[in-house]
Amino acid sequence: MNWSVFEGLLSGVNKYSTAFGRIWLSLVFVFRVLVYLVTAERVWGDDQKDFDCNTRQPGCTNVCYDEFFPVSHVRLWALQLILVTCPSLLVVMHVAYRKAREKKYQEKIGEGYLYPNPGKKRGGLWWTYVFSLSFKATIDIIFLYLFHAFYPRYTLPSMVKCHAEPCPNTVDCFIAKPSEKNIFIVFMVVTAVICILLNLVELIYLVIKRCSECAQLRRPPTAHAKNDPNWANSPSKEKDFLSCDLIFLGSDAHPPLLPDRPRAHVKKTIL
């Protein structure tokens, strides 16, 4: 694996994320991915070999293991982490697409721009980011449900009773390292729940922020705002211009009417 490429992808994801997104990224790659790579394979490496039943009936141990472990924890976690981390790369790819499109536009036109800031979450990029948050939270919720369906209460007992064929009768089977596995399972479940909460909080934050910005754009500017020197380049001025309000430089008063023309025929102009 080329770690420089991996580091570049992570830095790109971190660059275009909010504070909540950066916390989520650190939590996933430090407490989930690294812990999984270092610990999971060692704890579950020889799980089937260490699964022991008090019978010598050929095939009984394998059948009992398959009954109590239909899907390995390690493989479920691997699939979960892959599906959870991939949507974050969609944001980086969308920003790269915007930059490439902006570059082609500059080469063709030579002036102006398509995006004032290609990395700013506006338009399609905002929807891409919201989709990635929703997808990540949904994936974690689905996998938590699957784990609970396969292993109720997420914990493993030290001994299970099996009566599946070809076992001659009910046999006792013993799981290797149950306490160590339960600690690891609880850790992975708790970190997944925290990641879900972070995704939901970030999603709510983005929606509230976007609604607030839209409300500010629709709000008419006050006289104090129009007298502000920075108001000349603000969206409020553009809105006043589009609504055909007559604004004079340094004043919000209407001009005096010409004596020989009615007020309705005065051409409204912005200076």
From Swiss-Prot:
Q: Which UniProt keywords apply?
A: Cell junction, Cell membrane, Gap junction, Membrane, Transmembrane, Transmembrane helix
Q: Which residue stretches are annotated as topological domain Extracellular?
A: 41-75, 148-183
The record's similarity note reads:
Belongs to the connexin family. Beta-type (group I) subfamily.
Topology versus the membrane, per the UniProt entry?
Multi-pass membrane protein
State whether keyword Membrane applies: yes
Predominant cellular place of this UniProt entry's protein? membrane
Has keyword Transmembrane helix?
Answer: yes
Q: Where are the transmembrane segments?
A: 21-40, 76-98, 125-147, 184-206
Task: Note the Pfam families from the entry.
Answer: Connexin
GO biological process terms on file: cell communication; labyrinthine layer morphogenesis; spongiotrophoblast differentiation; trophoblast giant cell differentiation
Tissue specificity, per the record, is: Expressed in skin, much lower in testis.
* Stretches assigned to the Cytoplasmic side: 1-20, 99-124, 207-271
Query: Which source organism?
Result: Mus musculus
InterPro entries to which the protein is assigned, alphabetical:
Connexin, Connexin311, Connexin_CCC, Connexin_CS, Connexin_N, Connexin_N_sf
Q: Which compartment or compartments is the protein found in? A: Cell membrane; Cell junction, Gap junction
Please indicate which superkingdom the organism of origin belongs to: Eukaryota
Per the record, GO CC terms?
Answer: connexin complex
Function statement: One gap junction consists of a cluster of closely packed pairs of transmembrane channels, the connexons, through which materials of low MW diffuse from one cell to a neighboring cell.
Quaternary context: A connexon is composed of a hexamer of connexins.
Q: What is this protein called?
A: Gap junction beta-5 protein
